[in-house]
């Protein structure tokens, strides 16, 4: 149990770092400077004891200590998700080179998914890294099949979802817009290459 708790703590710490990546990468802010994160609203530097995964979020009452700006629940969610995922992967693979590659891949997918969800676009280098990591431990054939299937799925979803939005808002321009992010198809390919066809289908629809 102590071993798993230690792995959980490591996962939570990495989850906090993933939050930094998710915030800074789309805004093209250096990952090195400033070294300390700050409040997006008042730019007040976040003290070390205000940056403890999950715990600080609870004790700060979900708001900035300086300006009382609400802190998004997405931060502790990503930390907890990363922590739990790290423990589960450790239990399955134990400590070896394969575990390191798989953990890096899943961390990358978390960053890709959240950025894609928020901005409908993802950096090419993160996609390339995810695909390379998936190919190391996955199946190229499954990846290509999944990219094709998900591309078709995007067309169908875009047609129906945007048509409904167009009717509700009486805005015909919405019919030509995509309802999914630009990174969804490559991400689907990575999932397919990693999990295989049957598990990949389940993961996509979940």
Predicted features by range, described:
Residues 1-6, 167-169:
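Short, Lys/Arg-enriched, disordered terminal segments
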Residues 14-19, 82, 86, 146-154:
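Alpha-helical transmembrane segments of multipass membrane proteins
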Residues 18-74:
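Membrane-proximal soluble regions of multi-pass membrane proteins
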Residues 62, 68-140:
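Intramembrane alpha-helical segments
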Residues 107-206:
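Functional transmembrane core segments of multi-pass inner-membrane proteins
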Residues 3-27:
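N-terminal signal-anchor transmembrane alpha helix
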Residues 24-32, 91-95, 117, 158-167:
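Transmembrane helix-loop junctions in multipass membrane proteins, especially transporters and channels
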């Amino acid at each position: 149990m102590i071993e798993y708790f230690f792995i959980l703590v490591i996962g939570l710490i990495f989850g906090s770092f993933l939050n930094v990546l998710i915030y800074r990468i789309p805004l093209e802010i250096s990952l090195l400077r400033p070294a300390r994160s700050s409040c997006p609203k008042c730019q007040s530097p976040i003290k070390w004891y205000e940056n403890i995964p999950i715990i600080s979020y609870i004790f700060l009452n979900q708001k900035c200590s300086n300006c009382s700006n609400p802190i998004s629940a997405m931060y502790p969610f990503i930390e907890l998700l990363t922590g739990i995922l790290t423990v589960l992967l450790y239990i399955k693979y134990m400590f070896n080179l394969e575990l390191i590659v798989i953990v890096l891949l899943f961390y990358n997918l978390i960053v890709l998914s959240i950025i894609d969800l928020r901005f409908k676009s993802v950096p090419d280098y993160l996609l390339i890294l995810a695909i390379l990591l998936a190919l190391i431990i996955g199946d190229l054939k499954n990846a290509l099949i999944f990219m094709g299937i998900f591309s078709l799925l995007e067309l169908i979803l875009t047609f129906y979802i945007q048509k409904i939005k167009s009717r509700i808002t009486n805005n015909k321009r919405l019919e030509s817009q995509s309802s999914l992010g630009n990174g969804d198809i490559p991400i689907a390919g990575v999932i397919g290459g990693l999990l295989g066809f049957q598990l990949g289908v389940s993961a996509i629809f979940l």
